[in-house]
Amino acid sequence: MLFTLSILSTLLFSTSISAIEITQNRVDHGTITTSIGDITIDSGAYWSIIDNSISTFIGNLDIKSNAGLYISSTISNLPLLVLLNSGSASITNDGIVSLDARTSTQGSSQFNLVGGSFENNGEFYLAASGAIPMTMGLTGKSWNNNGLIVAYQNERSSGSVKFGVIGQTITNKGQICLTNQVYQQTSKIDGSGCVTAKKNASIYISNVLDPQSVSTEQNYFLADDKSSIITQAVGFNTQVINVFGFGNGNKIGLTLPLKSGNGGQAYSYDSDSGVLSLSSGLFGQKFNIGPGYDSKLFSIVTDNSEGIPSVNNGAVSYSGPVPSQKSLPSACNVECKPVPNAPDDGSSSSSSVVSSTTSTASTDSASLSSTSGEESSASTTTTESSETSNTSSNASETNGSSTESETTGSATTSEASETINSSESSETSGASETSQSTGTSESSETESSVTESSETDSITATTSDTTSSGNDNSSVTSSSDASTDSITSETASSSSTPLSGDSSQVSSLTTGTSPDTIASFQTDSTSFGFGSGSPSSGAVQSSGVTNSTPNTGDVNTQSNTANIATSDNTATSTASNDTGVNTATATTTGTGTGPDNNNNNNNNNNNNNNNNNNNNNNNNNNTNNSGVSAADSKASGDISTVTASSTTLISVASVSSTYPIANESSSPSSSSSSSSSSSGTPGEVIPNANGSSKLSIGMTFMISGFATMFALFM
């Protein structure tokens, strides 16, 4: 099991996702992964992807009615690559799709969507700056446009846009708008739709070798004087291409120079049929421009527009206005809308539902995550900060007041939501009024995040003790495993404010499935003891902090030797585990002001006026501090229970080297364990609670390292 856990701890979270459904508006900034399978955007929602250099799709794209997919760049040197390369994937748009690289002026963008089928019933925008030539392509063996497609560039370049597959047939029953763009038609085209060229756009029909390559119902509209249409001269094609809007200087041409040949003229116009014929020797093409043109206003010119074959004298221009005898078909009257701006709420947000097929559970040094069935964007247990005020009105008669609450939560992986478990009393303030002094204490916020791959019971126990001299607030948070693969995370927080001269005591226990190391850093007098309580499911419950009667376990005592009127005690204990996810944190911050506490111990003769903590099998008659319950004598049993399930190392490091840190005693009842005869050395390690040996900090790291290696290879 340890070997399996070690292997899992080195793996990254990996999930094979088959689909994602956008149900509410979502905006993503910067680099994201779009290779996530099928994508569906529901009606009323949009997905806006901003400044993501490469957006690669691997599954079906389905944009519902009144929905939108926006991919855009706002950075001049960030080109956009939007790719779909799947022979079986389909693109279905009933809403709005906008691929917008108009601001990308320093790089070549590319839009190339190659799938099994393409169907547009809504609005589809392909936009670029045109500063650098780029290619745009919407490819599918089955290709249908019933809506609006806009191919736009800020300025004309040699780039082009292509629809469909070479040699296959596309069906256009809608409107295709070109602005500063070249549409190169390489496939057959069917349908009664319209292709509109405006603002220096060109239509290049390069497949007229097939006499049926262009439907007689398909329409090409030259919307301004800078637009043009050109066909490839590969033979004299009897097919007639419908052209609207010819006039005002725009052009119709071939890929060869116009010249007389084979008994014919370079160009001719039939006013009855409205057909304009162009020829280059044996090659030629016919265009139905409509009636009403004046033959004197035709002239041979050169179309040297970018992106199309440019030949001298290869086109015809008409200098007069467009005659009104030929009305536009309904498809050409559809408005060529401007490219929409991408929605941007200024921040990243996410509203989606993800379906996954397979998932691999993995952990790092702090968490274990698993996703199954639906997206779990975050599964977090958060300890919220709340303030609880404990007031003792009869401090002279109160031995202690404790409030204990247990909150049980479970973290599951079947729901796609953020799980937040709040444990109150993470920030606790207590006030005790006495005739001599007032002490307040606040415990720091304790935040723990636990994500497990199996069901886990999380138990939070908060214990607050109030004595006549001050408040001791102890908060212990632990997690017990519901399965052998789950990891236990425990947090212990303790806060105590004694009267002046009192020593601050911190009690912390950590249990888990792997060794824990607890490092304690103290700046003033600190002693360690263990409060009583009955562990449940691995949780350790403390009824308070003792300072008079020691437990039979190992006691680390430090006494002040100076007369101090005001004492600020701060103790912080942090437990970490490099190979697991167990975390234990004990934080004690206290400030007390008042007269010296004289702990008169009847059976000892140590009369220290500042801090006389002689806690070795004696009856302590504390005149100021009397908050110790008889149940504290059970601590040794609790220690045995805890240490039987894990190896706990308590490392004590003192900031001030002038004070002794620990007393070592082979017998708990030894009366020589007083502050005056302390032989402890800063930086000692006390294994478990026996006090039988001392190890250096370096040895602690060695043992922790060997334990880690052992866990990895077992």
Curated annotation (Swiss-Prot):
Sugar-modified residues: 200, 390, 394, 399, 421, 473, 577, 621, 624, 663, 690
Descriptive protein name: Cell wall protein IFF7
Primary location: secreted
Localisation: Secreted, Cell wall; Membrane
Assigned GO CC terms: extracellular region; fungal-type cell wall; side of membrane
Alphabetical UniProt keywords: Cell wall, Glycoprotein, GPI-anchor, Lipoprotein, Membrane, Secreted, Signal, Virulence
Function: GPI-anchored cell wall protein involved in cell wall organization, hyphal growth, as well as in host-fungal interaction and virulence.
Signal sequence bounds: 1-19
Region of interest (Disordered), ranges: 320-633, 660-692
Entry keyword Lipoprotein: yes
Species: Candida albicans (strain SC5314 / ATCC MYA-2876)
InterPro entries reported in the protein's UniProt record: Hyphal-reg_cell_wall_N
Family membership noted in the UniProt record: Belongs to the HYR1/IFF family.
Pfam family name, one: Hyphal_reg_CWP
Feature: compositional bias, Low complexity: 346-504, 520-544, 559-590, 597-625, 665-679
Residues of the propeptide: 691-714
UniProt modification remark: The GPI-anchor is attached to the protein in the endoplasmic reticulum and serves to target the protein to the cell surface. There, the glucosamine-inositol phospholipid moiety is cleaved off and the GPI-modified mannoprotein is covalently attached via its lipidless GPI glycan remnant to the 1,6-beta-glucan of the outer cell wall layer.
Spans through the membrane: none
Induction comment: Expression is down-regulated in absence of GOA1.
